[in-house]
């Protein structure tokens, strides 16, 4: 049973993973619009009939402040500051807002709620996935297996591919648009794409 979890609640905070500055929050309307796009893209790969879609707002919106505090008490500040992006921002004199530190905890709690056996994510999500393992152990569950994938660099060859960075190739774009964008990629970047997307090195 595959579970596609839509983070409609923490999206209003903004995922701080890999960010050097605080990410602007999204409105509820933007979150729902994005969720529709995510599911459309996901079902290009996943079997719709064998996939359950869940929204974590279903449990987070029911939490009392007392329950939130109890959940926070399970994670230390030292653990949070060991996270590379938070650590880099603190050392660089940049702000890390308290609400951003909620994101890994919420993602970790998702694993408890859906009783995840395996969680898939990019390498930038490893910290959050490990928080989930710890919380599952505390709840008497078998901790999930973490499967992380390399991040795909964007067309700028610098940052990860992201719509918010404008350096992406959309999976639902017209073929002509995809082709044009890929043709703009450097040879060095194409070598990386071959390795990450096809699992093989490009023949020269």
Where are these predicted regions, by residue range?
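N-terminal catalytic cores of NTP/NDP-binding nucleotidyl/phosphoryl-transfer enzymes
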Residues: 1-15, 118-126, 132
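Short acidic-hydrophobic sequence patches enriched in Asp/Glu that either
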Residues: 5, 27-34, 170-174
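Anionic group-transfer/hydrolysis microenvironments
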Residues: 9, 109-112, 150-152, 165
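Short, well-ordered, mixed-charge alpha-helical segments that flank or form enzyme active sites
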Residues: 11-14, 60-65, 128, 153-156
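Short clusters of hydrophobic/aromatic residues that line enzyme substrate/ligand-binding pockets
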Residues: 13, 26, 86, 90, ...
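Surface-exposed, active-site-proximal loop segments in enzymatic domains
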Residues: 14-22
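Divalent-metal (Mg2+/Mn2+/Ca2+)-assisted nucleotide/phosphate chemistry catalytic cores
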Residues: 23-148
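Catalytic adenosine-cofactor/nucleotide-binding cores of aminoacyl-tRNA synthetases and other
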Residues: 73-76, 150-204
């Amino acid at each position: 049973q595959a579970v596609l979890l839509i983070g409609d609640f923490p999206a209003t905070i903004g995922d701080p993973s890999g960010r050097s500055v605080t990410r602007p929050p999204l409105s509820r309307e933007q979150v729902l619009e994005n969720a529709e796009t995510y599911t459309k893209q996901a079902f290009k790969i996943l079997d719709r009939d064998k996939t359950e879609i869940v929204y974590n707002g279903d449990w987070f919106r029911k939490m009392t402040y007392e329950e939130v505090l109890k959940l926070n008490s399970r994670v230390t500040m030292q653990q949070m500051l060991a996270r590379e992006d938070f650590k880099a921002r603190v050392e660089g004199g940049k702000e890390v807002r308290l609400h951003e530190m909620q994101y890994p905890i919420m993602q970790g709690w998702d694993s408890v709620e859906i009783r995840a056996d395996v969680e898939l994510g990019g390498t930038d999500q490893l910290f959050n996935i490990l928080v989930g393992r710890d919380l599952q152990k505390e709840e008497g569950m078998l901790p999930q297996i973490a499967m992380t994938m390399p991040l795909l660099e964007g067309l700028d060859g610098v940052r990860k591919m992201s719509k918010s960075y404008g350096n992406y190739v959309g999976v639902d774009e017209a073929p002509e648009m995809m082709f044009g964008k890929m043709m703009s990629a450097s040879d060095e970047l194409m070598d990386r794409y071959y390795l990450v997307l096809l699992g093989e090195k490009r023949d020269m």
